[in-house]
């Protein structure tokens, strides 16, 4: 009997049809055709920035269409083997089908999550910043651990990872780091991580092996294009230059190429030392500044939506959102959703972070 597999196949077929409509495949194919025609024009590469964005969009569209087509073939193959194969008499076939069903159901779950990401900038690349809280070396080490977790998580999503700014700790770890994630729905997923992350563990830096509590704050803001107008007056900016910090090398600490820009009315400060030239670092800083200011607009909208709701949900971006306990027991628990896991190693390897993000989106996706 394979009645349970029949029901799972029915669920996949229904999900396939819904995914096809929600992904607007026909619209994506038309957009792809138009963009590919643009690349054939002689003056396409005259505006390198614009051409780069078009090329990135083409890659994204091709990936989304191919992903759907591959999924469709997998579901059709499942239907074929389920209808034509003798599943009940072939345990090995059933085991293979079970594995394939699990993979397809996971893919479908990813698409269902993306349906919650309907915000105007959810599809955009994003900047993620981690800052050490009080606690000195402990907190700096915690920042480095979180940085590693997010980079591994981004790799699983096949996002491009660029370190924009990084300040090493005095003894170990990282005081501050800003990284850019570029890929499909990077901001939509990463926005769930905004807030304070708390670590409880026996410190490797304490010879008395006492338990320590460390804090790190995470901020996430979307990269926005020039079509979104953000009013930034030159007179409101303070621009400082300084020497890049790092492990050394020919281009480190030689010239004042790193740039820090402060928006005086809001106090927002951004810095970049990734590029070798001051001009390039300044351009990167302005992108981050526009993104941070746009994030403020989004936050104000969110607060208004929360006030308008009868059943107000508490979201405070500056508040503690997740606890990571390594000793005396192992537990990672999200304060907002209650989602938890005891497998802290898999969590810190980025393997379970999606589960926490999905729980957040299921709870708050409609208003975030």
From Swiss-Prot:
Chief place of localization: cytoplasm
Gene Ontology molecular-function annotations: translation release factor activity, codon specific
Residues annotated with N5-methylglutamine modification: 250
Alphabetical UniProt keywords: Cytoplasm, Methylation, Protein biosynthesis
Subcellular location: Cytoplasm
GO CC terms of this entry: cytoplasm
Annotated InterPro entries: PCRF (IPR005139), Pep_chain_release_fac_I (IPR000352), Pep_chain_release_fac_I_sf (IPR045853), PrfB (IPR004374)
Function per UniProt: Peptide chain release factor 2 directs the termination of translation in response to the peptide chain termination codons UGA and UAA.
NCBIfam families on file: prfB
Name used for this protein in its record: Peptide chain release factor 2
Gene name of the encoded protein: prfB
